[in-house]
From Swiss-Prot:
GO terms for biological process: regulation of translation; translation. Binds directly to 23S rRNA. The L1 stalk is quite mobile in the ribosome, and is involved in E site tRNA release. Protein L1 is also a translational repressor protein, it controls the translation of the L11 operon by binding to its mRNA. Belongs to the universal ribosomal protein uL1 family. GO terms for cellular component: cytosolic large ribosomal subunit. Pfam families: Ribosomal_L1. It comes from the Bacteria. The gene is rplA. Part of the 50S ribosomal subunit. InterPro entries: Ribosom_uL1_bac-type, Ribosomal_uL1, Ribosomal_uL1-like, Ribosomal_uL1/biogenesis, Ribosomal_uL1_3-a/b-sand, Ribosomal_uL1_CS. Keywords: Repressor, Ribonucleoprotein, Ribosomal protein, RNA-binding, rRNA-binding, Translation regulation, tRNA-binding. The lineage of its organism: Bacteria, Pseudomonadati, Thermodesulfobacteriota, Desulfuromonadia, Desulfuromonadales. This is Large ribosomal subunit protein uL1. GO terms for molecular function: rRNA binding; structural constituent of ribosome; tRNA binding.
Length: 233
């Protein structure tokens, strides 16, 4: 057994897989079970009662986590003229148009999120096949295609998380770092779940939130008490 496998096994022993944990206890266990030498990300997986194969059951959106993500988010903006200046003033790391498209076509992806003004989407569309698979394509549904450039940049810098349900009906999203205090992780978790509840499709029938689990990057998953989570949002 490798050293990593031994550490994971030891971390797993801290968890009772037959039970669901209240939010506070789950966060405590996740922090205790983290064993990597780096500051692990805390991830949440939510299984929803939807079938994303049907367009009317797609769940997609974004939420600004109240306590951020604990990392410097590199923001790229496709804009010209006054909106270019607005983006720079708001703290965007890269702003441009065709010049940025050319860099991306050459294999440059040194950014975490991309924003575009609506008039730039004709240009951005040229690299849709490069941005889309990486989750970087600007989209009006999550507020990254907008003329409100300053707000979009500031939200991204503050810890905006985009979410989209996968084929299996699961949404994955980060809610912070292991080094965060428990209240900060809890606040981010509740904000994410609340956003998912608000994004519930009208076509979704039956139980909507079926399972919530939390883990650190290298750690085992912990199942949360859904009732405890939803009672706090």
């Amino acid at each position: 057994m490798s050293k990593t496998a031994k550490k994971l096994a030891a971390a797993s022993e801290k968890i009772d897989r037959t039970k669901v944990y209240p939010v506070a206890a789950a966060i405590d266990v996740v922090k205790q079970a983290a064993y990597a030498k780096f500051d692990e990300t805390v991830d949440v997986a939510v299984r929803l009662g939807v079938d994303p194969r049907h367009a009317d059951q797609m769940v997609r959106g974004a939420v600004v986590l109240p306590n951020g993500l604990g990392k410097d988010v590199r923001v790229l903006v496709f804009a010209k003229g006054e909106k270019e200046k607005e983006a720079l003033d708001a703290g965007a790391d890269y702003v441009g148009a065709e010049d940025l498209v050319s860099k991306i076509q050459e294999g440059w992806f040194e950014f975490d999120t991309a924003i575009a003004t609506p008039d730039m989407m004709g240009v951005v569309g040229k690299i849709g096949k490069l941005l889309g698979p990486r989750g970087l394509m600007p989209n009006p549904k999550v507020g990254t295609v907008t003329f409100e450039v300053s707000r979009a940049v500031k939200e991204s810098k503050a810890g905006k998380v985009e979410f989209r349900v996968e084929k299996a009906g699961i949404v994955h999203a980060p809610v912070g770092k292991v080094s965060f205090d428990a209240d900060s992780l809890k606040g981010n978790l509740l904000a994410l779940v609340e956003a998912l509840v608000k994004a519930k499709p009208s076509a979704a029938k039956g139980i909507y939130i079926k399972k919530i689990s939390m883990s650190s990057t290298m750690g085992p998953g912990i199942n949360l008490d859904i009732a405890d989570v939803t009672s706090q949002i």
